[in-house]
């Protein structure tokens, strides 16, 4: 097993460049001369260097690994093989977005396969289990085969026929048979054996014509599902037709024939006349010379290509009789037994030399590096689009990113040269297209909602650049200048934008900054993060409503059943991680912890399924919402990023200084790190346990920096039982500098407190956080619950006195009559992430003053003003605060003197601790 790519690549970058200077965030300074910039002396560890041990993360991960182990990757490869015209090995593509029948005609197919490859690569990098390696090798082998097939002209896929062999046209191959065009006679017969494999309406068995006005065709199914022959010189409105009476059965051979003699046309199925038209004024000769004689392709671009097998196609210059139709006669115009087993030329057995050619509707790739599960047409069409239409073009470069990332991840973790070659070729192909486009065309493309979305492709390209030294110019072709400039100038332009279309752009900009030193990339990424966290952040760490951003500081107004698209959380974690490598601000890992322990963990249902990853797409944040773990049949973007998240939970637990002088402990997660000859074992039940233990095996000198979470009111450290005098301020790191010896033990204690976080737009709409954990109310009611919390508040401001633990259920509590549970539990219980704060009376430590809690015009209350000053150093300090606030409210006419006196007496008698 090969160590993770991240460490190796960052080492390479660090050896080539100097550490970054301390940067400000003013756009003016972005004019500095660009040069490559390594992260500020800080490096991540590879997946193989950090092993998860038993805990909440390993349990979720193991569910995903079970899915990865059991799922047949040939099902995912089906659409790639079909697109290349290859045998799909009997595999059935998954449903949802990854198949041809998915949303928008399957225009996003291939993206989930890329996610799956990344998951396998990370699983192998983490565990070394050969089952994942074999699946990776199968996928890479198929990709190589598909790319080779796309590079050449279509080749016949020979299958057993009705007699001898037949030609199979795989659904999704976009292949058809091109017969030599020639004028047709007035009398005419077409016969063929057909075996449809799909029930798409209007797929043609044959279509001879010039365009969509002058043609004759036989469709396997019309709009009513039965065969139809038609001829016209004036488009659909002028068609003279014959309809069958019953559908052609799927996966069975049927004999079809059309005869035309004089004014009579007849349609036969299996030798039986199923339709006739005796009033036809048109015949094939009346159409004159036609440009195209196609088998399987329509002159209407929106019609599907015929999927199935064709055998014994014959064209006659006379109308066969009913008895002759099913006889084994050879057409005098042309005759195709389709007995070929190789090549792309199909011989004419009539003796006239009218040999046919297998072709693709879209021709073929513009560059040999092209690899996709669909034709190149989406990429071509995007270049002239001016408005979004995902039914026509759905984020082709987004799908290309998933495939590219999967290939890069596969190379990172296996060193399989095929993955590198495929990734390199894919980038060469992209540059061959994008490099020719004017800048204004690219800017228009990248600004189109959905169609122009390209995900994290820049990050993947720069990752590949660190290996090959190539493709940096390609990465810069994805610059969306209007967005970069606005964010570099710290202008918030996010309202109304599609969140996940834009979040991964900024991780790519950070990677470009590292490669080029261009500070506008750094400024844009750093400033963008602050536009989302916290102004557009839900308490679970996610962002977006219905996939889009609302105005800054609109959070309560964004609570819906389509809140917090899970991809957004995944990509914000990647951005936060990368920002921390440059700027060791604890805020990035405070956010990382919040999002990882809540939305990301909670996005995985707590059960296994052999067919589905069981991940959320949206998070329902409405009162009484229920999480949907099977959105859109299980192959969406969010299920893809969910699989990736679950197989790299450990990638940010620890970071190290590039000179190995310091180890950062960013997350408190049970794990084992092997580094510089030392093994560090972190043992914890966090977040059930409110602390952690680190044991050192081996000897080394280094600084150990421990993150003090922003929520931690208390944080104590001992080494070998000896208390350490550290200035553990919330939202910082504390550092222990020493020569570590074998057997040293570091223990950290960080008691959780309960706090209520209010939304900026509706302060009374709040959520409960217990340490880093979002506690949700398990309740099916569909209106916001009203909860009061001040009545049991401690001098520290901790609200945990309101909670009654549920025996035998860690992190489960009762708050009065309301049951609370951690959001990260992946259940289908109805829940409330938010509630309405209601403090009708002034109560201290359970003692009721009998005084109503007065409210200012802005909605803030007397108790709010008291408790905003917490923590209180002593009971005396608390009494001083109550007295001062009461006096002020009396002075402002908001409280009577009598109520003032009752409040003061209650505060003095209350058993505050």
Residue ranges, per PLM feature:
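Extracytoplasmic low-complexity segments
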Residues: 145-172, 208-211, 275-288, 322-364
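N-terminal secretory signal peptides and thylakoid transit peptides that target proteins
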Residues: 1-18
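C-terminal beta-rich recognition modules with glycine/proline-rich loops and embedded aromatic residues
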Residues: 525, 589-605, 609-695, 729, ...
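Flexible glycan-contacting loops in extracellular carbohydrate-active proteins
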Residues: 277-309
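Extracellular glycan-recognition modules
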Residues: 153-164, 170-231, 237, 250, ...
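Soluble extracellular-acting proteins and domains
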Residues: 840-913
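Low-complexity, Ser/Thr/Pro/Gly-enriched N-terminal "stalk/linker" regions
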Residues: 24, 32-112, 137-138, 142-153, ...
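Trp-centered recognition loops
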Residues: 193, 246-257, 733, 741-743
């Amino acid at each position: 097993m090969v160590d993770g790519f991240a460490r190796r690549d960052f080492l390479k970058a660090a050896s080539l460049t100097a550490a970054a200077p301390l940067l400000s965030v003013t756009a003016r300074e972005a004019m500095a001369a660009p040069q490559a910039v390594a992260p500020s002396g800080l490096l991540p560890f590879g997946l193989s260097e950090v092993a998860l041990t038993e805990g909440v993360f390993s349990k979720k991960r193991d569910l995903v690994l079970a899915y990865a182990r059991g799922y047949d990757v040939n099902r995912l490869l089906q659409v790639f093989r079909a697109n290349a015209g290859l045998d799909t090995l009997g595999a059935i593509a998954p449903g949802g977005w990854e198949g041809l029948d998915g949303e928008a005609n399957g225009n996003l197919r291939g993206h989930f396969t890329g996610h799956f490859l990344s998951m396998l690569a990370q699983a192998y990098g983490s565990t070394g289990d050969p089952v994942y390696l074999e699946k990776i090798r199968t996928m890479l082998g198929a990709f190589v085969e598909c790319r080779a097939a796309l590079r050449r002209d279509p080749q016949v896929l020979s299958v057993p026929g009705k007699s001898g062999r037949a030609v199979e046209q795989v659904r999704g191959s976009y292949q058809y048979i091109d017969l030599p065009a020639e004028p047709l006679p007035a009398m005419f017969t077409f016969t063929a054996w057909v075996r449809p494999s799909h029930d798409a309406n209007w797929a043609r068995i044959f279509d001879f014509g010039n365009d969509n006005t002058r043609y004759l065709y036989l469709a396997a199914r019309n709009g009513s599902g039965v065969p139809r022959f038609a001829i016209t010189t004036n488009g659909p409105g002028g068609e003279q037709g014959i309809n069958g009476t019953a559908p052609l059965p799927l996966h069975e051979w049927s004999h079809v024939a059309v005869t035309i003699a004089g004014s009579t046309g007849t349609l036969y199925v299996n030798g039986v006349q199923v339709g006739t038209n005796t009033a036809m004024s048109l015949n094939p000769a009346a159409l004159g010379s036609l440009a195209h004689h196609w088998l399987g392709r329509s002159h209407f671009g929106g019609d599907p290509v015929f999927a199935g097998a064709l055998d014994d196609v014959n064209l006659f210059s006379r109308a066969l009789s009913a008895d002759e139709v099913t006889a084994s006669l050879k057409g005098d115009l042309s005759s195709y037994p389709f007995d070929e087993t190789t090549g792309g030329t199909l011989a004419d057995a009539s003796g006239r030399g009218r040999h046919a050619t297998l072709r693709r509707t879209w021709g073929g790739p513009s560059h040999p590096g092209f690899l996709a599960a669909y034709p190149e047409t989406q990429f071509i069409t995007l270049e002239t689009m001016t408005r979004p239409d995902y039914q026509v073009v759905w984020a082709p470069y987004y799908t290309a990113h998933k495939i590219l990332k999967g290939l890069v991840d596969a190379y990172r973790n296996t060193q399989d040269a095929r993955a590198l070659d495929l990734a390199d070729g894919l980038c060469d192909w992209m540059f061959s297209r994008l490099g020719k486009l004017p800048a204004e065309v690219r800017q228009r493309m990248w600004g189109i909602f959905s169609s122009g979305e390209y995900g994290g492709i820049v990050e993947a390209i720069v990752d590949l650049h660190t290996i090959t030294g190539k493709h940096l110019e390609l990465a810069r072709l994805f610059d969306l200048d209007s967005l970069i400039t606005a964010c570099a100038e710290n202008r918030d332009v996010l309202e109304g934008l599609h969140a996940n279309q834009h979040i991964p752009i900024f991780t790519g900009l950070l990677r470009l900054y590292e490669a080029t030193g261009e500070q506008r990339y750094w400024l844009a990424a750093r400033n963008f993060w602050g536009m989302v966290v916290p102004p557009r952040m839900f308490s679970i760490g996610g962002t977006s409503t219905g996939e889009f951003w609302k105005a800054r500081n609109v959070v309560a107004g964004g609570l819906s059943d389509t809140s917090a698209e899970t991809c957004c959380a995944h990509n914000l974690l990647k951005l936060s991680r990368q920002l921390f490598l440059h700027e060791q601000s604890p805020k990035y890992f405070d956010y990382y912890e919040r999002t990882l322990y809540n939305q990301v963990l909670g996005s995985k249902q707590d059960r296994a399924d052999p067919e589905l990853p069981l991940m959320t797409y949206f998070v329902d944040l409405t009162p009484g919402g229920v999480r949907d773990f099977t959105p859109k049949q299980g192959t969406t973007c969010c299920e893809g990023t969910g699989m990736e998240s679950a197989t790299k939970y450990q990638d940010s637990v620890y970071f190290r200084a590039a000179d190995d002088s310091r180890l950062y402990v960013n997350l408190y997660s049970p794990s084992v790190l092997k580094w510089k000859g030392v093994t560090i074992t972190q043992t914890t039940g966090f977040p059930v346990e409110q602390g952690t233990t680190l044991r050192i095996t081996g000897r080394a000198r280094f600084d150990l920096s421990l993150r003090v979470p922003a929520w931690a009111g208390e944080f104590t450290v001992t080494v070998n039982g000896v208390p350490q005098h550290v200035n553990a301020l919330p939202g910082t790191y504390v550092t222990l500098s020493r020569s570590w010896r074998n057997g040293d033990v570091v223990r950290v204690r960080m008691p959780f407190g309960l706090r209520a976080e209010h939304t900026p737009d509706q302060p009374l709409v709040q959520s409960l956080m217990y340490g880093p954990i979002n506690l949700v109310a398990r309740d099916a009611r569909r209106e916001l619950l009203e909860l009061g919390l001040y009545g049991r508040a401690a001098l520290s401001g901790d609200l945990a006195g309101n909670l009654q633990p549920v025996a035998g259920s860690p992190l489960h509590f009762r708050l009065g009559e309301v049951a609370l549970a951690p959001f990260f539990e992946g259940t289908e219980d109805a829940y409330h992430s938010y509630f309405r704060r209601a403090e009708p009376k002034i109560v201290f430590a359970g003692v009721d003053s009998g005084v109503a809690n007065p409210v200012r015009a802005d909605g803030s209350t007397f108790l709010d003003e008291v408790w905003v000053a917490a923590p209180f150093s002593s009971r005396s300090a608390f009494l001083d605060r109550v007295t001062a606030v009461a006096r002020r409210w009396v002075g402002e006419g908001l409280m009577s003197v009598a109520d003032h006196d009752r409040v003061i007496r209650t505060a003095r008698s209350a058993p505050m601790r």
